[in-house]
Regions:
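Cationic, low-complexity basic patches in intrinsically disordered or flexible, solvent-exposed regions
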Residues: 7-9
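Intrinsically disordered, low-complexity, charged terminal extensions of DNA damage-control enzymes
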Residues: 2-5, 16, 20-53, 59, ...
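Active-site-proximal or metal-binding-adjacent scaffold patches in catalytic folds
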Residues: 12
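Catalytic cores of DNA base-excision repair glycosylases
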Residues: 35-37, 42-233, 237-246, 250, ...
Length: 383
């Protein structure tokens, strides 16, 4: 849902809010309750007028839908998630359908969304629900938090948004709103900073209307209190926000300490026979776990050795344009090496190999760089 015009948003009632103290215990519990009620009242008033209420997972809401959306939304924006969510719901209308599906198909539908461990955990969690809970999504915090890929905030979001249970949340959007409003210094990835933010989230979460409030906090962070260029003049918390008062929003939340990412090189072998290209499935865990990728080598010598062992002629081996793919912990410089072959019988003994048909793609999960190179091959970019 788009944010409405600035002139409209400024009509939201604003209250003066004295910041809660993150470092010292409040001297008066009544003061904290009053401040928290002011905070939640402002946020709820804003949400009733401007919050998002028609996202696909908000229609005919169920714990399964909310869980699926929350996992997809980790590290990913709403606009990107929507088409993936809709495809998943068509193919897997129930958690039992997801549990019984092959992992390859789940990874295939996830291709392009990134952070593939989420998809593997999603599949494991669905199987766990089918086995331990008879296909009914659990409804207690401990049971939900025990699912693979679900932490405290995600569990709280699932139960509060779908069932109205009283649990605070602390996703990236909520961290940003709280850190700015109460000037919580430091990177939220540090335990002591996260602890302060959790304490604030617990204090401001109202006893009633938690479903609307938690959604409102996520919307406020996504639509108004954005990472860059926040719309402070449109924020219902503007008069009580320390960062707004001090024009210091850029300082909050604190940034992750910079680190120099190591660089690696990977040679990808794009071996093509007519409309088919050789792919190999990665091991279940580790980098691109369970996805199909081109045979990969640390250097060109390793690639030539692999071809020689299989008596494959490398005379027509051609290097394509190299490019960089960045992971959270290193850069991978990918060097694609294209090789047309007249026969693929020498590679059929590869147990995890697949000849991928470019014209009729099989339903398997692909790493993003692999999908990019396959698309180039489809349009004849190797020539």
């Amino acid at each position: 849902m788009q944010v409405k015009e600035e002139s409209q948003l400024r009509k939201v009632p604003v209250y003066t809010l004295r910041p809660l103290c993150c470092n010292l215990a409040p001297s008066n519990n009544e003061t904290v309750i009053m401040q928290a009620s002011q905070f939640s009242a402002q946020v709820l008033s804003w949400y009733d007028k401007y919050g998002r209420k028609t996202l696909p997972w908000q229609i005919d809401k169920t714990p399964y839908k909310v869980w699926l959306s929350e996992v997809m939304l980790q590290q990913t924006q709403v606009a990107t998630v929507i088409p993936y969510f809709e495809r998943f719901m068509v193919r897997f209308p129930t958690i039992t359908d997801l549990a019984h599906a092959p992992l390859d198909e789940v990874l295939h539908l996830w291709t392009g969304l990134g952070y593939y461990a989420r998809a593997r955990n999603l599949h494991k969690a669905a199987q766990q629900v089918a086995t331990l809970h008879g296909g009914t999504f659990p409804q207690t915090f401990d049971e939900v938090a025990a699912l693979p890929g679900v932490g405290r905030s995600t569990a709280g979001a699932i139960l509060s948004l779908s069932l109205g249970q009283h649990f605070p949340i602390l996703d990236g959007n909520v961290k940003r709103v709280l850190a700015r409003c109460y000037a919580v210094s430091g990177w939220p990835g540090k335990k002591e900073v996260e602890k302060k933010l959790w304490a604030l989230s617990e204090q401001v979460t109202p006893a009633h209307g938690v479903e609307r409030f938690n959604q409102a906090m996520m919307d406020l962070g996504a639509l108004v209190c954005t990472r860059s260029k926040p719309k402070c003049a449109l924020c219902p918390l503007q008069n009580g926000c320390v960062a707004t008062a001090n024009a210091s929003w850029a300082q909050y939340p604190g940034k992750k300490p910079k680190q120099t990412l190591p660089e690696r090189t990977g040679y990808f072998l794009l071996m093509q026979h007519n409309d088919e290209v050789l792919l190999a499935q990665r091991p279940p865990s580790g980098l691109w776990g369970g996805l199909y990728c081109f045979p990969q080598f640390e250097d060109e010598d390793g690639l030539h050795q692999w071809l020689a062992q299989r008596q494959i002629n490398a005379d027509n081996l051609t290097q394509l344009t190299a490019f960089r793919h960045t992971f959270s912990h290193f850069h991978l410089d990918i060097v694609p090496m294209w090789l047309p072959v007249s026969s693929f019988t020498t590679c059929m003994d590869e147990g995890n190999a697949l000849w991928y048909n470019l014209a009729q793609p099989p339903s398997v999960g692909l790493a993003a760089p692999v999908e990019r190179l396959l698309q180039q091959l489809r349009v004849g970019a190797q020539v």
